[in-house]
Amino acid sequence: MQHIRNFSIIAHIDHGKSTLADRIIHLCGGLSDREMEEQVLDSMELERERGITIKAQTAALEYKSRDGSSYLLNLIDTPGHVDFSYEVSRSLAACEGALLVVDASQGVEAQTVANCYTAIEQGVEVIPVLNKIDLPAAEPERVIKEIEDIIGIEAQDAVRASAKTGVGVEDILEAVISRIPPPKGNPEAPLKALIIDSWFDNYVGVVMLVRVMDGVLKPKDRILLMASKTTHLCEQVGVFTPKSRNRESLSAGEVGFIISGIKELKSAKVGDTVTLVDRPAPQPLLGFKEIKPQVFAGLYPVESNQYDALRDALEKLKLNDSSLQYEPETSQALGFGFRCGFLGLLHLDIVQERLEREYDMNLITTAPTVVYQVVLRDGSVIEIENPSRLPDLSKIEQIREPIITATILVPQEYVGSVITLCISKRGIQKNMQYMGRQVMLTYEIPLNEVVMDFFDRLKSTSRGYASLDYEFKEFRASDLVKLDILINGERVDALSLIVHRASSQYRGRELAQKMRELIPRQMFDIAVQAAIGSHIIARESIKALRKNVLAKCYGGDITRKRKLLEKQKAGKKRMKQVGNVEIPQEAFLAILQVGEK
């Protein structure tokens, strides 16, 4: 065990984490030159294309150090995006050390800080690495000072490397061996293994990626999953060197996979503890929590006969993504579809893109909403994720909305505009720290203000320099109302919103105007109204298209013309009674753009 090192790589998006992982694997001979391809550990096509890591992956590598002894290095690749922060914390719990990779030209970003704090809280040894040192814009001295100021760890002896050219990669591995402690664990104790990740394989069922803390696991052992309380027969164990290799056992300190014929991912939750049935561990490992979706949206097939295909596609995606939740729902405007829950906006985006790309779906997505807690007059509390399901206002005591703590890192020259943005989103400033050229702002902001367009606007007000990290804080009572859109007097459930009373008038007017621009003109007049309860706060009319019925009249009596106009008017009136209005997809997305000005 003295010769095992478990480490992961923490980095912000685009700071070169996956490239560095590729280099390390290549250097240790995990893959031959022919098999090397960009981003080896990002096995999903979408991960490669967006250049982000979504699922955690591992590689067990053998490395011969400069002093001649050989070591087993377990590299655990973690997602870097804020939506997947729980997966990051589990990956870090499986390690003794972490490489903090910072781009030498860009400096420290908010997500790096958040993940680094997670690592320090879990007592993981952090080694700073300056990547992209070969760039002409690299400023190692400034970035070292930033790491020390913002994160507060010693960074003078940070390893300087360039994953692209391969410079300094060996120094990184030497630092891993000298500075990261070997795993502690007792091979004699009852088995305890932490599930870092799990995914579904078409041939063998669920594959669990685990870090064995204590004990030994062999094939043919009966295992117990402590959080889901299910037992299974362990069929095979092994390690990834990115390719899978079977082994005869996994013992304390090692990272590998377990296959035990589990059919669904619900049983193998990330962060759960695996132990043996006949000799169970007294208590599970700390830190397990159920992942709760934060953002909800409706997904509807454009063709209603694709409903079954969409259900199958969601089922398949759920096999590999236990945090995705969905339930069937119907909407008068959009027909049959599903209400889906996601970890965050990136997660929603990825799921939608995978449905469209891998399953050829044509989807309409409604505006994302968040979960509200509604306290009723009789004292009971219900949770609502769809605005159209809000009970009658007379029954509601108060509505509580989710509040997040947002940490924003931004260069000094953009602080003013970022603060203005946060205030316009009802943010409350909690802290402001100057660190070198950067400023760290801490705000409490309602989550429903963030899901709309906060991220895009943060990037545009700061010319792309600001970075954001957020975590859920609490539900807090607020003065919220439900805003409905009526088209020809009919409520369109998919367009309902829950908004703050102070901005409801403005939002209603804006939405009605947007709808007027987006709904195509029909043969009859269309009235678009915004309402709060039974109170109409805004109205726009879409004028009818009409034929010039007087074109054939020359001169003649006025009554002749009046007769033709009256006839046309009566026809339009009849049409309006039976006509229904098709609402285009852009109209549903317009909700997102309200309040941009």
Curated annotation (Swiss-Prot):
Where does the tr-type G domain start and stop, copy by copy? 2-184
Please give one Gene Ontology molecular function term for this protein: GTP binding
Query: Which organism does this record belong to?
Result: Nitrosospira multiformis (strain ATCC 25196 / NCIMB 11849 / C 71)
InterPro entries per record: EF-4 (IPR006297), EFG_III/V (IPR035647), EFG_V-like (IPR000640), EFTu-like_2 (IPR004161), G_TR_CS (IPR031157), LepA_C_sf (IPR038363), LepA_CTD (IPR013842), LepA_IV (IPR035654)
Q: What does the function comment of this entry state?
A: Required for accurate and efficient protein synthesis under certain stress conditions. May act as a fidelity factor of the translation reaction, by catalyzing a one-codon backward translocation of tRNAs on improperly translocated ribosomes. Back-translocation proceeds from a post-translocation (POST) complex to a pre-translocation (PRE) complex, thus giving elongation factor G a second chance to translocate the tRNAs correctly. Binds to ribosomes in a GTP-dependent manner.
Regarding protein family, the annotation reads: Belongs to the TRAFAC class translation factor GTPase superfamily. Classic translation factor GTPase family. LepA subfamily.
Which Gene3D superfamilies would you find in this protein's record? 3.30.70.240, Elongation factor 4, C-terminal domain (3.30.70.2570), Elongation Factor G (Translational Gtpase), domain 3 (3.30.70.870), P-loop containing nucleotide triphosphate hydrolases (3.40.50.300), Translation factors (2.40.30.10)
Q: Which chemical reaction does it catalyze?
A: GTP + H2O = GDP + phosphate + H(+)
| Top EC class for this record | hydrolase
For this entry, list what GO says about its biological process: positive regulation of translation
Q: Which domain of life is it from?
A: Bacteria
Pfam families, per database record: EFG_C, GTP_EFTU, GTP_EFTU_D2, LepA_C
Where does this one sit in the cell? Answer: Cell inner membrane
Ordered alphabetically, the record's keywords are: Cell inner membrane, Cell membrane, GTP-binding, Hydrolase, Membrane, Nucleotide-binding, Protein biosynthesis
Q: How does it sit in the membrane?
A: Peripheral membrane protein
| Gene encoding the protein | lepA
Main localization is membrane
For this protein, the Enzyme Commission number is 3.6.5.n1
Q: What's the protein name?
A: Elongation factor 4
Binding residue positions for GTP: 14-19, 131-134
Q: Which GO terms describe its cellular component?
A: plasma membrane
Please give the HAMAP family that the UniProt record associates with this protein. LepA
